[in-house]
């Protein structure tokens, strides 16, 4: 992944900081890190920076913020990238607090596809459909076909 997409991921996290307005809650023990780069797009430093930012936002507001990159979402669910995101979120016990509130961005590199999944009342309050549309506008144009560089 080149600078442009890395910057977009940072902008995504920054937008989450501005949008989330819930109180802090205890973490439920997700089986994945806040940033899971299975596709190998990020350098070690970039991964650590994004991880720290996501962890800070998640703990401060009680809404888990996750970025997951995979080679192919079909490895997790064959019926679509959104269902793959849903599956990863639930199978890996992601989310903050007793209700597992969180938002997850999944990037599937092989087919240049992505999905955003929002779970829990805190997340749904902070990221209603209007908020999600606004957030998507920050990065969606750049995640189109062949615009990952």
Spans of model-derived segments:
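Bacterial N-terminal signal peptides that target proteins for export
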Residues: 1-9
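Intrinsically disordered low-complexity regions specifically enriched for long asparagine
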Residues: 5-6, 19-22
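Bacterial N-terminal signal peptides
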Residues: 10-19
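Folded, non-transmembrane soluble domains that reside on the lumenal/extracytoplasmic side of membranes
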Residues: 23-149
